[in-house]
Amino acid sequence: MSTLFRVAWYRFRATFSHRWSGYLTIVLLVGLVGGVAMGAIAGARRTQSSFPIYAASTNPSQVDAFIAFVDPAIHDYAGYYPAKARAMAHLPHVKEAETAIGFDANLVLLSHLHTHAEPGQKPPVFEGSTNDDFTKEDRVTLVQGRLANPARRDEVVMNAQAAHQLGLHIGSRVRLGFNSDAQLLSPDCCSAKATPPKVVVDLRLVGIIVVASTVVQDDVDHLGSQVALFTPALTRELAQCCATYSSSALQVDGGAGEIPHVQSEIDAVIGKALATAGNGSGATAGQVQVAVATAERAIRPEAIALAVFGGIAALAAILIAAQVIGRQLRLGADDASVLRALGAGPAVTAADGLLGILGAVVLGSLVAFAVAVALSPLAPIGPVRPVYPYPGVAFDWTVLGFGVLALVAILGALSVGLAYRAAPHREAGRRRGAAARASAVVRAMATAGLPVSAVAGVRLALEPGSGRSAVPVRSAILGAVLALTVVTGTFTFGSSLDTLVSHPSLYGWNWNSMLLSGFSGDEDLPQHEATTLLEHDPYVSGISGIYFGSLKIDGQRVPVLGGSPGAPVQPPLLSGHGFDAANQVVLGATTLADLHAHVGDTVTVSNGATKPTRLTVAGTATMPAIGTQGPHLEMGSGALLDYDLIPATARNLQESTVPGPNAFLIRLRPGANPTSARRSLSRIESRLNASSDGAGGVVGVLRPAEIANYRSIGTLPGLLGGALAVGAVIALGLTLVASVRRRRRDLALLKTLGFTQRQLAATVAWQSTVAVAVGIVVGVPLGIVVGRTLWNLFARDIHAVPLPSVPILSIVLIAVAALVLANVVAAIPGRIAARTPTALILRAE
């Protein structure tokens, strides 16, 4: 073994001067494409974990207790009870407590502002705490300006949504009035006869903040995500006179196992207080805790897409590197034959040049490590990126360590295998058993009378030849196929992703518009009047009235969409059939899995008011993001069933005298002008919601979080795709150059037979073009199949309608660009071959 190494080391030093360029090529290709692969996979992991890491940095609470609300119907006449807040803060296992006090119903906007409310969007929530400025527990994140001074009553911070809705910016001033609780409960409240507000405050917006629970959300939650925070100084002044509601956020000591005990203790405290202090709605999981699960699910598609891209890049790195390594070994075949003639054994001839290649693989893997680290500041992608607490360079040692080891091990093994296969004793055996085979394509072209340069070029591209002049033409063609497969597959997957984002029907919004009642659909639309107006609208082809609610299905609480059996407008199906009868239910795919049920099974639905009902699972559908604030339908979760299963009181929470659906799903006639239709529907909405004080509206689309967040992923996918394309182009170019150089002897013979310089250049161009053409014929369809297959797997994973998109124009441009590249690459070696004296090439023969 020591002798073998000494010989290999000697040969490495002796041949390095004319083999270094090949080694450098291996280093650069492995480093670039392998680094992109590791960077993408590490970025996917960093993206998927980004929100839990951010949430942990805000010091989140685990339990929320909504303890007071001004409402005579529940005998609650004040929005804040300090005694209840103190009692919960001193419960066993509670280590920290923060009480947020809201002033929404008591608040009067006295400034004349240019507001920008979207249809169905709620006004901003105005809250404050008496003992915290939201910098300790459930910390807010400052993104612009500064935090308010806790000791000043005239400063306020808002999130960007609230500032945009109110038309404010840093430095803007707004005047607010606050009615006392007694004024709020007065019959004359908020009318022209009402007394002036008890407290008037001029506030200046000093900062834009982000609240953790609103970082990742769908468009339904976005309708109610506007938040403004008062200082403790102002909150203490308003708490005793003008509070609408209050809730306590609690941190639990002792781990997650103590949370249920604390929740039961909170319910007991609230129950004891009923006789003297009002009513409470119990304890729930903290907002940030709930948001973590939602955010991880919403971010997952971007992380999966990034990981899929990384997997494609990793495969490309291995295959491209294998091609380059094989060519490098073949370049030393003549030297290996000389060594064999001098008495070297199979081990020595196989090891010739292998030491340099293995060194290049190791060095390239280290370069890939550096490239992946250099790409790390581009992650995480998505909505968490602006508030991620630990941006910049990151070392994901799991990906980096395993990635480097995998590259070294896989490429090292391939190098040894290729070196053994290319050893002279094996090569000689193959030559003895191989016979020169003529290509049918070449014969056909010759028979057709095509120019001799064309026939010669096609022969050089397709026929390997025999004996010492044999050339591995399959490697050149395989390199072209590989490059075009990778690029086409990447473009197909990316096009399908763009199609999903731009086609709402693929993510559940299987209609054109929704007529919404109240804020986020929390009121009713008069059934008869709304149906009559919509059915007589010239632009409308179909409508379905729907109700929002939640029911227990097989004991699990599930958000539901109540409709009528056989309604013309329903979410798009994934399996089975639609909701056609009152004894049927259509479920989201995630909900179906959570219930451990299948299409055709029977489930039990209960509402707590009537006898449980057994329903047959008719099918699964891509559920839209739809409903009111809180738990609502999402892409994979929810149920569509008969609206009569939702209790009548739950369908009419505002106790409307003319009850009806919370919303209407509207499908327009084919060819209807969208602008004219929107104006017509807006007139209907104004008539139906005339008394809603601006609430409700016509909504074009509500996107799920998975889709809404896609637009915030930044430039990383484009950069990675560009790097992969560059790697594929470089590999293709090197393949073509090496293929032409291997044919120098054949070109010299053609020149001896009378070929002119122009004919030689044409021959080389034909050789290169044919190799790429075969790559196009095989690689493009294969890339489309790979891209479509990956997309179908991805779409089913996120429960979207699996409809892959093939970018025909882009693929045509890829094919044209590949042909242009083939001729550009062939021009230089073709010109060199034409000008090289024949004697220099044939002298070795």
Regions found by a protein language model. Name each.
Residues 93-96, 539-542, 838:
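Glycine-centered tight turns that cap/initiate beta-strands
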Residues 59-77, 444-447, 451-581, 586-590, ...:
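Juxtamembrane segments of multi-pass membrane proteins
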Residues 1-28, 46-52, 56-60, 330-353, ...:
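Feature of multi-pass inner-membrane transport and sensor proteins
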Residues 15, 19, 319-358, 396, ...:
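Interfacial "coupling" helices/loops that link adjacent transmembrane helices in transporter permeases
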Residues 1-318, 322, 327-331, 346-347, ...:
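Membrane transport/envelope proteins' first extracytoplasmic loop
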Residues 662-664, 691-820, 825-828, 837, ...:
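C-terminal transmembrane helical bundles of large multi-pass transporters
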Residues 34, 311-314, 318, 323, ...:
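Hydrophobic positions within alpha-helical transmembrane segments of bacterial inner-membrane proteins
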